[in-house]
């Protein structure tokens, strides 16, 4: 395995952990309408769970309103049920051709709870990044034992791995801080 290949793979995995964090935080509502709130909603469509965003257009006509317009009107009631069954805490209003979702204002207590959830998701991402670093370090140590690197090269690679980890953790912290700010300010 080439020297940089280990670090490159670790950096790619760290980037994926950051992307997962951003996706997961996108589904946490912050008092404003955001189409990503519905990303985790699946509708039973002819016996198969289908993501809502593949069955309907989701628009934001007003700052706190989501409008879900199904491509096939026959599934309107199924979509309404799926939204009710999700843990969004938003009641859908079915007008016969589309579903309106009014995102309620968040109470101070709810905002604090959501901020805790944001921190917890951030911590999970940091743990994932640290596990990736540990795996990369283990691979480097094995390669060093096999004589693939001299001690100077090994220490340089260890430092590069730690630098990559520090950068990834910093990005995770920034993502979490931005989402916390969004949630707390609403």
Swiss-Prot record:
Coiled coil: none annotated. One of its GO terms (biological process) is translational termination. Keywords: Cytoplasm, Protein biosynthesis. CDD domains: RRF. Its main location: cytoplasm. GO terms for cellular component: cytoplasm. The keyword Ligase does not apply. It is found in: Cytoplasm. SUPFAM superfamilies: Ribosome recycling factor, RRF (SSF55194). Pfam families: RRF. One of its GO terms (molecular function) is ribosomal large subunit binding. HAMAP family: RRF (MF_00040). Belongs to the RRF family. Responsible for the release of ribosomes from messenger RNA at the termination of protein biosynthesis. May increase the efficiency of translation by recycling ribosomes from one round of translation to another. This is Ribosome-recycling factor. It comes from Pediococcus pentosaceus (strain ATCC 25745 / CCUG 21536 / LMG 10740 / 183-1w).
